[in-house]
Curated annotation (Swiss-Prot):
It comes from Pediococcus pentosaceus (strain ATCC 25745 / CCUG 21536 / LMG 10740 / 183-1w). This is Ribosomal RNA small subunit methyltransferase H. One of its GO terms (biological process) is rRNA base methylation. It catalyses: cytidine(1402) in 16S rRNA + S-adenosyl-L-methionine = N(4)-methylcytidine(1402) in 16S rRNA + S-adenosyl-L-homocysteine + H(+). The keyword Thylakoid does not apply. HAMAP family: 16SrRNA_methyltr_H. Its EC number is 2.1.1.199. GO terms for cellular component: cytoplasm. It comes from the Bacteria. One of its GO terms (molecular function) is rRNA (cytosine-N4-)-methyltransferase activity. The keyword Cytoplasm applies. It is found in: Cytoplasm.
């Protein structure tokens, strides 16, 4: 079995934010290394249940053993699916309401550290970046077959890369000679396309482009928006959603969606009281995002960009 070692970020804060009830029904939309799932399960009584989603079979296989004590007790159900299928998958299992939903977004450490998965510019590996290894679209297809305009669009939108046009132009001219096959080739190409002065600041020059391609391959923002909409719909009264984001695009999406659900819209002038059907049906648990402590930042450098937002259904 492939090891799936992963240091869970904001573990206590995220699970405590769910206010777990012993007999509640909970969903971990991002099983990964099982850290959040384990802590939720430890708080459940015999009538409580957890549904843990992951589109990566490696994570499911690892946690069959990692969480074996809870598997044996029948308290956890693993669901191999993209969390954009949240409502459908739960309906198939006879569940139409839940007491809490957790998201720990981004690529887990084992996916980054497994050179063969092609997520990282730190290793030279075939271009892949699929979280679900059964899906057809991969990074090689994006880099070699998508048009110049489509590449510029995703580099700007998902990578917020200032030099999107230069990188896309370099990719276009390079692939005319031969296909771009590996992460190493792509990283070198990006580095050569970005001006030397810009390469000296802001970390590795390939970071933003790799992020953009990964988001495009996995449709991460589309999946998140669809899933959050479903999670809000199936939440029981007093149920909560905890979301950890790791980059500004995700955080802005979550912040916007939570704001829409917790603020009163435009009201008619002179209205003496607010009708019940116009009152918000959700409230924010934390107005500002919760971030890792200094101790956690020292122990886990990958936690530095994490932000936790929590919402509750009234």
């Amino acid at each position: 079995m492939t090891e799936f070692k992963h240091t869970t970020v904001l573990l206590e804060e995220t699970v405590n934010g769910l206010d777990v009830k012993e007999d509640g029904i909970y969903v971990d939309c991002t099983l990964g290394g099982g850290g959040h799932s384990r802590l939720i399960l430890s708080k459940l009584g015999e009538n409580g249940h957890l549904y843990s989603f992951d589109q990566d079979q490696t994570a499911i296989d690892y946690n069959q053993k990692n969480l074996a004590e809870y598997v044996a007790k029948g308290q956890v159900t693993f669901v191999k699916s993209n969390f954009r299928n949240l409502k459908n998958e739960l309906n198939h299992l006879g569940i139409d309401g839940v007491d809490g939903v957790l998201y720990d977004l981004g690529v887990s450490s084992p996916q980054f550290d497994d050179a063969g998965r092609g997520f990282s510019y730190r290793f030279d590996a075939p271009l892949d970046m699929r979280m679900d290894q059964t899906q057809k679209l991969n990074a090689r297809e994006v880099v070699n077959e998508w048009s110049y305009n489509d590449l510029v669009r995703i580099f700007f939108r998902y990578g917020e890369e200032k030099y999107s046009k230069q990188v896309a132009r370099k990719i276009e001219s390079t692939r005319e000679e031969k296909p771009i096959e590996t992460t190493g080739e792509l990283a070198d190409l990006i580095k050569s396309a970005i001006p030397a002065a810009a390469r000296r600041t802001g970390g590795h020059p390939a970071k933003k482009i790799f992020q953009a391609i990964r988001i495009a391959v996995n449709d991460e923002l589309g999946a998140l928006e669809e899933s959050l909409e479903q999670a809000l719909q199936i939440l029981n009264p007093a149920g909560r959603i905890s979301v950890i984001t790791f980059q500004s695009l995700e955080d802005r999406l979550v912040k916007r969606m939570f704001k829409e659900q917790t603020e009163i819209g435009d009201l008619p002038a002179g209205l003496p009281i607010i009708p019940d059907d116009m009152k918000p049906k959700y409230k924010l648990i934390n107005r500002k995002p919760i971030i890792p402590s200094e101790d956690e930042l020292e122990e886990n450098r990958r936690s530095h960009s994490a932000k936790l937002r929590i919402i509750e259904k009234l």
